[in-house]
Amino acid sequence: DKVIVGGKGRPTDAGTHVALIAYQPGTVPADQICKSVVDFSDFAPTIAEATGAQPLSPTDGRSFFPQLLGRKGNPRENIFIYYCPKPETSKPLRFVRNERWKLYGNNRLFDVANDVLEKKPVTSPASKGIRKQLQAALDQMPSEGQKLMTFD
């Protein structure tokens, strides 16, 4: 656990990784750390489950409420990010990541658990398996320039 100063507006963990504090006395155990990767679509089902509300359906989100309770739950294997913090001055990036690895659309792979600032791309033949797995996940997601939504 390192302190990272600066980096907002960058695709490294310094700009995209945000800590989440969950507080529900008597329900969510104190001093618990959950390493699950979640994305924004997971918040609505999580809040619904935590409050006993009916979840929206259909949804891409997964509740991470069980993990907050210290249970296994149904954690995501990875998350997909389409990142363009400054559309007027930066080119969009696509990447997929899990708790340890991150693969960009340009095929750069990083071991983010050990290289938080992404200084050393992983190129070793030993990374072939994880690269293939993450590439398969990335291939399922919209590519740059695709229309993501239609309003008919």
Placement of each model-derived feature along the sequence:
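Ligand-binding/active-site lining segments
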Residues: 14
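Short beta-strand-to-turn element immediately C-terminal to the catalytic PLP-Schiff-base lysine
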Residues: 21-23
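Catalytic cores of eukaryotic secretory-pathway lumenal/extracellular enzymes that build
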Residues: 17-18
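C-terminal cap/loop subdomain of S1 sulfatases and analogous C-terminal strand-loop tails that border
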Residues: 1-11, 28-32, 36-114, 129, ...
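A short, conserved beta-to-alpha structural element at the edge of catalytic cores
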Residues: 138-144
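C-terminal structured subdomain/cap of oxidoreductase catalytic cores
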Residues: 123-134, 138
